[in-house]
Amino acid sequence: MPGKPVLHYFDGRGRMEPIRWLLAAAGVEFEENFLKTRDDLARLRSDGSLMFEQVPMVEIDGMKLVQTKAILNYIATKYNLYGKDMKERALIDMYAEGVADLELMVLYYPYMPPGEKEASLAKIKDKARNRYFPAYEKVLKSHGQDYLVGNKLSRADVSLVELLYHVEEMDPGIVDNFPLLKALRTRVSNLPTVKKFLQPGSQRKPFDDEKCVESAKKIFS
């Protein structure tokens, strides 16, 4: 019987948070090995665990997987969150990559110099309000179904709902003008596995505060 997946990263959101969300949505329990020092990262590098000397890394099914997209695609395939055919998978990839583009801006925001944060936040809000959220609202309106692809939960829905939560932390109410996105967020949030993940005390990480940023810098810089 294989053990639980083990996630290797620091104790913050970063590039691991979408993986945590997807595993949680799939109802998969996982363990975390938090890097606390540069030496912790060096040990993973020296023992050959990191193909490109980078985290996140996930131990699952006897493999040590790196590269966020590869990890997400494996989990999505394994737990039937990746569509029923090539066409659906292409759409899921397209929607998920759009999410990743904006999520990357959100991810970098806490790590930016103080003098650049105001402009960065304004850019995130503008891109969310005028480019990304309208695009996903249009998709949901075009087919009138509950989920983005195939009327079934996929990794694209999970990543989009995660993004909605993260952007709303920065600008409460930004989703209010997108009723179908709000409905999707409610629908996904009420799934038992996700509802559990959204409760206090879960493995979901809070916004990267100054302490988290300093910890990450000590490990990776």
Curated annotation (Swiss-Prot):
Alphabetically sorted, this entry's keywords are:
Cytoplasm, Transferase
One GO cellular component term of this record is: cytosol
Q: In which tissues is it expressed?
A: Liver, nasal mucosa and epididymis.
Task: Provide the residue positions that the database annotates as binding glutathione.
Answer: 9, 45, 54-55, 67-68
Induction (UniProt): By ethoxyquin, oltipraz, butylated hydroxyanisole, and phenobarbitol.
Ranges for domain GST C-terminal come to 85-207
What cystine pairs are annotated?
A: none
Q: Where in the cell?
A: Cytoplasm
EC number(s) on file: 2.5.1.18
Q: Which Pfam families match?
A: GST_C, GST_N
Q: Which GO terms describe its molecular function?
A: glutathione transferase activity
Please report which protein family the annotation says this sequence is part of: Belongs to the GST superfamily. Alpha family.
Q: Which PANTHER family match?
A: GLUTATHIONE S-TRANSFERASE, GLUTATHIONE S-TRANSFERASE A1
Query: What is said about its interaction partners and assembly?
Result: Heterodimer of YC1 and YC2.
The name this protein carries in UniProt is Glutathione S-transferase alpha-5
Q: Record the organism.
A: Rattus norvegicus (Rat)
